[in-house]
Amino acid sequence: MEQYAANSNSSAEQIVVQAGQIQQQQQGGVTAVQLQTEAQVASASGQQVQTLQVVQGQPLMVQVSGGQLITSTGQPIMVQAVPGGQGQTIMQVPVSGTQGLQQIQLVPPGQIQIQGGQAVQVQGQQGQTQQIIIQQPQTAVTAGQTQTQQQIAVQGQQVAQTAEGQTIVYQPVNADGTILQQGMITIPAASLAGAQIVQTGANTNTTSSGQGTVTVTLPVAGNVVNSGGMVMMVPGAGSVPAIQRIPLPGAEMLEEEPLYVNAKQYHRILKRRQARAKLEAEGKIPKERRKYLHESRHRHAMARKRGEGGRFFSPKEKDSPHMQDPNQADEEAMTQIIRVS
């Protein structure tokens, strides 16, 4: 398991993942982090050396692989791992434009680590569902708002969230590049006034706060490629965030609004459908319907005058003065005025 910690001037971010892909959503842009720990290089001193690939701008892409660290200026920077306490491995990366260093800590599976007031607990063996718990017992004040204790439990290795209210989307990837699971939950921590728990790994995810309970359902499948919708929770008028469902490409669109009929019409429609299906199976009628039966009748119907809703006028209604065309009535009135004058 790997841990990515980015220290800035105002606050610290901590991301705990296993080899896969993490997408972190921020206010100004999107930060995508991809970790691959299979390729490692051993230095002359016997320490493990791992490199990063950084592309500046928005979105900011960080890729950990067996290559090298490429900054916005195009200059490669080698990052060397330093062994820490309790069998941990710490890598420090200089960041241009900010004060401080970015630290990447490698934690063996099944080990508990406590650092900077945050506890990271990893449970489960290989091939089983693992649980990652991120806790922040201390109180933080951001933009004049007091943020209380926040606890996040992630099951299924899919969704996580930082203490600043930023969302992390973890998508496991197969060897062939297909995504196993997909989903996203965005919950601004500043908009909630109490402890917050997000659990992922089942069909139903419950988010509880001090003001109420919001239930979110995420499509989660084991080894099946998921093409369902994406659920986003955005702050509403109150303290409880609202839920919006955005269909992803490939999701089935809803059918048109059904036509309402009475019981007699419904049974008659069923009988006609059964009779037509029987004739189509016997080959007596074609399966594709024509636009019209006779072309002459179609032209005649299109030439007839229609009323509101496309209804045809009856002969009596057509001859009545209040059913005439308004333009035609105005022309007749003008003709009478000219004759009188």
From Swiss-Prot:
The entry lists its GO molecular-function terms as: DNA binding; DNA-binding transcription factor activity, RNA polymerase II-specific; RNA polymerase II cis-regulatory region sequence-specific DNA binding
GO terms for CC? CCAAT-binding factor complex; nucleus
Modified positions (Phosphoserine) are S320
PROSITE patterns documented for this protein = NFYA_HAP2_1, NFYA_HAP2_2
What ranges does the record list as Basic and acidic residues composition bias? 305-322
Q: Where is this region: Disordered?
A: 294-341
InterPro entries attached to this UniProt entry: CCAAT-binding_factor_CS (IPR018362), NFYA (IPR001289)
Keywords per UniProt: Activator, Biological rhythms, DNA-binding, Nucleus, Phosphoprotein, Transcription, Transcription regulation
Composition bias, Basic residues:
294-304
Q: Which compartment or compartments is the protein found in?
A: Nucleus
DNA-binding interval(s): 290-315
Q: Which top-rank group of organisms is this from?
A: Eukaryota
Q: Name one GO biological process term.
A: regulation of transcription by RNA polymerase II
Q: Where is this motif: Subunit association domain (SAD)?
A: 260-283
Under SMART domains, the record lists: CBF
Please list which residues make up the signal peptide.
none
Q: Using the chain's own numbering, where are the disulfide bonds?
A: none
Pfam family name, one: CBFB_NFYA
User: Which family does the record claim for this protein?
Assistant: Belongs to the NFYA/HAP2 subunit family.
Q: Which PANTHER family match?
A: TRANSCRIPTION FACTOR NF-Y ALPHA-RELATED
Functionally, this protein is described as follows: Component of the sequence-specific heterotrimeric transcription factor (NF-Y) which specifically recognizes a 5'-CCAAT-3' box motif found in the promoters of its target genes. NF-Y can function as both an activator and a repressor, depending on its interacting cofactors. NF-YA positively regulates the transcription of the core clock component BMAL1.
Q: How does it assemble?
A: Heterotrimeric transcription factor composed of three components, NF-YA, NF-YB and NF-YC. NF-YB and NF-YC must interact and dimerize for NF-YA association and DNA binding. Interacts with SP1; the interaction is inhibited by glycosylation of SP1. Interacts (via N-terminus) with ZHX2 (via homeobox domain). Interacts with ZFX3. Interacts with ZHX1.
Spell out the protein name for this chain: Nuclear transcription factor Y subunit alpha
Taxonomic lineage of the native organism:
Eukaryota, Metazoa, Chordata, Craniata, Vertebrata
